[in-house]
């Protein structure tokens, strides 16, 4: 595999891929198979890869609705990325062949649940970093009574709203157009393709100012009387979210599914913050996530 050392080499690699897809054969399935071969030759920066997947899905699906597992979602590149983290395990990839191929390149660490740490009937759930809402939809299907979906990026929140409507769960899921952090504040977020890219890692492109709140402040302000499950994929702000959720973890001991791949020391820092709040937690590490329960 060749690592690209300059913008010109990267652009040439992208042109090669697009030439195969758009000139040699318009079949998206063939395109995916060619892309798999080319990825062995070229190393693509994450942002460029996401942008390319976005183009491929847009060309194949347009503005259509994708249906799988009895659910419906707006076609979008985030669908592939989120589906891989939320619905797919080694036993089930039940989508059409194009999406399945894309998913196959993105499955790295399984779902936001394990046998030990899972959504239960009647749960109150915080979905921090809801994006377009696949986790919120799944949590509702599994019996959660109320889901609070935190999504500060306007374009993602609009897709989230549409997906809740498509699946008739607007009564169960409340959209909170906020980020989560250590305290109430306004921060700059790097945005790629209308979706959150990073709070803390400068990736170029445009920034959005997003309003953030701490989980503890939000729980107190809104009179939330139970929190049973917290899922957090907040683009590098997971440790800040946990610093602002210490009282919630101490009082309610929610089950936790927290991403740990944005910063090199995430696994140990995030574990430390969980145990600082509530030493009774049992911690389970996977390559990209921490799961915890009392």
Regions found by a protein language model. Name each.
Residues 1-294:
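Phosphate/nucleotide-binding beta-alpha loop and adjacent structural elements of enzyme active sites
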